[in-house]
Amino acid sequence: VAALLLRETLETPGKAGALVTPEAQLARRVAAILERWSLDIAPSSGTPLTRCQIGAFLLLLCRWVRDPAEPVSLLAVLKHQFASIGRNPDHLHKLVSEIERESLRGPRRHSTLEDLADRLENPRNDNEDEERKRKPRPHCAALIRDIDKLHYPARAAFFDDQIDGKAAAEAIARLAEAIAGGPHIWAGKPGAQAAQFITQLGELSDAMGLMDSADFADFAETVMQRMIAAPDTAEHPRIAIWGPLEARLQRRDR
């Protein structure tokens, strides 16, 4: 209802309106509905970093890094909007679709990324695949080998059961840049907050000493859950989503 009322306000020339609510969850729901109508209205309170693309990407990498060949997390990384791996989006999407169809559905048959690349390049017709001969897919194998190379520098930080959390946080930041193809992921207010997250994660980890590598991803998520990214878009001239404090300082028609 709130989203409809805000949209209705725009249909009256010169009118302005605002949703005033102390509930961050309600503000996010209304903003999501408005976005479906191409109205980018971010709550003035900001957005949890975990709900931002860069935040979700970093947490995904924290879980993927320990077992990069795990099918579900590997696909999530390859399909993420930040992933480029040196290819244009259309080409990458085509290759990822082929890899998913040929090798990542059903039971896991590979142990490592190199094993997966080898199976794509030199298909093995398992018993259940006798009716459908698999074709060599060298371009798909090349993509897997490329992401394996990008992942390689981060392995040292997560190799042992007990790891240096600060080194692990820095490794995740470098891995994110490598997969995305540059430092542009830190752009804007969400990117700046994500960079602050890496710094804070490193400092907290350093204070704790060594930690179990299996616990790092959960710890990273706990740290990120407390962080809010400020709105990265200019305020709409006629409609807004405010908290009670902002509402006391401004007025709208509705």
Would you name each region that the model predicts?
Residues V1-R254:
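Polyanion-engaging groove/track-forming segments
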